[in-house]
């Protein structure tokens, strides 16, 4: 577990945390929910940037050279159960994972973002329109295909916490429609036969 933590509330807080960690040569970790099966967000002995309280979200019409249509902006603390509910209230859906308590912005999107709707809409990284981030040198910026495009592409699928600390993500929203799913389970009552 982290030895120290900063409850992040702004870009300035992140920049101060980054500066502190650099000046004192302290390992830095970034954590929202901690859903990481290899524990990268825990960082033993690190200074943790706890992103969980960046939980603003909004739905709006987005316009850029590459996409015009409905979109959702989610703070780094948003979990899927939060955004799924709010998206339904706006008549749209956003891509997400199966587990509703996973955070949307960190490792999910920045590691590609596979989920139940990927066959219909692509991976979450393919639906990401922009990232609001703080770079290691403390710059607060937007990364999109037209603004800071190298950082945008790096954040889109190279893993969370690798290139910048992401404060929010803007992702395409799709018109809500009916979906179907199935669950298949086999029960083996004989432990000698698998």
Residue ranges and their predicted role:
Residues 1-194:
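Soluble FAD-dependent oxygen oxidases
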């Amino acid at each position: 577990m982290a030895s120290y933590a900063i409850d992040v509330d702004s870009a300035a807080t992140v920049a101060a945390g980054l500066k502190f960690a650099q000046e004192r040569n302290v390992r830095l970790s970034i954590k929202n929910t901690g859903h990481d099966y290899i524990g990268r967000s825990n960082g033993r002995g690190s200074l943790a940037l706890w992103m969980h309280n960046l939980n603003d979200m909004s739905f709006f019409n987005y316009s850029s050279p590459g996409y015009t249509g409905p979109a959702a902006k989610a703070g780094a603390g948003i979990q899927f159960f939060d955004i799924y509910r709010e998206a339904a209230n706006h008549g749209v859906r956003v891509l997400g994972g199966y587990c509703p308590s996973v955070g949307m912005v960190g490792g999910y999107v920045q590691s590609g973002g596979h989920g139940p709707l990927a066959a219909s809409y692509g991976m979450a990284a393919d639906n990401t329109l922009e990232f609001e981030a703080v770079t290691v040198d403390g710059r607060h910026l937007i990364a999109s295909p037209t603004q800071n495009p190298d950082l945008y592409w790096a954040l889109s699928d190279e893993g969370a916490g690798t290139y910048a600390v992401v404060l929010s993500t803007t992702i395409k929203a799709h018109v809500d429609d009916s979906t179907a799913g199935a669950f298949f389970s086999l029960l083996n009552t004989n432990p000698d036969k698998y």
